[in-house]
Amino acid sequence: MRYLLLCAALCACAASGGRLVPAVEAPVLLAEFDSAAAAARLRWNQTPGPLFIAYELQRAAGEGQDFATIARIESAAETTAVDSGLAGDAAYRYRLLLHHSRPGRAPRVLVSGQVEGGIHQLVITWRLPSGFLPARLVVDGQGVVYVAGAGAARVERFDRAGHALGSWGLDAGQLACLEAVSLAVPALAVDRFNNLYVAYNLRERGKAPRSQWTKFDGRGRRIWTYPLEGIFARAVAVDPEGRIFIEGLNQLYQYNPEGELVARYPLPSLPAFGLHFWKGYFAVLVFPHLFTDGDWQAPRLVAYSGPERGEAVMIMGRDPASPEDSGGGLLRQPLDFAVDEATSRAFVLDAGHSGVVVFRHNRFLTSWGKAGDQEGAFRFSGAAEVVEDLLTGAAAQRQVMAGGIARDQEGYLYVADTFNNRIQKFGP
């Protein structure tokens, strides 16, 4: 027997030019999923050169899907690959096929173990009290998730795992919500000291809605409640210097942390909604296509250098290439957005796509979502009571669009899935 093994080894050595060829084993594949690039970075161990034919990298996208080849690599020294353009909240599986020759026999294929993962995958969902209709949310520096809705004049609080921490009441009156490009409900913002600011509107029978705002400290102590200038408060945001800005229908108001009015700025007639700060810039969703003579034919996310919204420094979104266009980067009915300044990403909640659209460096990066009530799906369209007459406060049930999104310091994303009455949390 030892004689036969020796003969076999000598034959293999002769077939390889006199060199003793090491045994070839199945490759070991590793993967790192990078949401900032919407990519999977793959690497594997190098195969001994004399018997190498090719690596074949395969991917299966989605549960129950078959593997398909995405790359064939014919250099044994090339042991890395990047699969870009990944969709969010999708399950990806990869495997590596090693094609190698065998002296005196037919070539063979060795298959690695599978690696799997994804970006922005669903982590958890939790429901709100019946009829709450969550539509705005924010996360403070301690990881407390604050949620405001169209159905109650209070703020619900949760930890990042969805455990209820109790609610803070705003007023004994009834909320006034306004149908604009998105449903205007109580607006939320936090400062670096974890104080919460809530700007909201209350119905008064036979009168215009009353706008006011409340400041809570991080323990829930109501510090003050003051009336607001202007007509119908729609957004509140705190800039990096701690200045507070509240947007009404036609003006932007600046306040200090004590609630004192500092300045007011007239807003251009261009339809816009939402307000967040991005690297100190005033970022809003703009709907110029609502003007028949506008140059843009679809909404944009625009960051302006100042409160007057005169100079745009960043613009995200594009016009449709055709009436049937539904491709990446085209915003249809954006509702809210969150930003990641470190990687220059914007996460736009878009009812037109029933999901989240992500931009990086002003360019489309990825997206995910679909309409429905199963986990990971969204319902941003539904019925809510809205003010029809700002002079009298008269209200009626209407079909509206609503939804909100926020990001915590670790990169997790929280979506207010309004008409499924729940919050959905997605991974970084």
Language model features: what each stretch is:
Residues 1-7:
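Sec-dependent signal peptide recognition
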Residues 58-62, 99, 426:
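Predominantly extracellular/luminal cell-surface or secreted proteins
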Residues 83-104:
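Beta-strand-rich modules
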Residues 15-51, 88, 102-121:
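Pro/Thr/Ser/Gly-rich low-complexity, intrinsically disordered linker/stalk tracts
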Residues 47-66:
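Solvent-exposed loop/turn segments flanking beta-strands in beta-repeat/beta-sandwich domains
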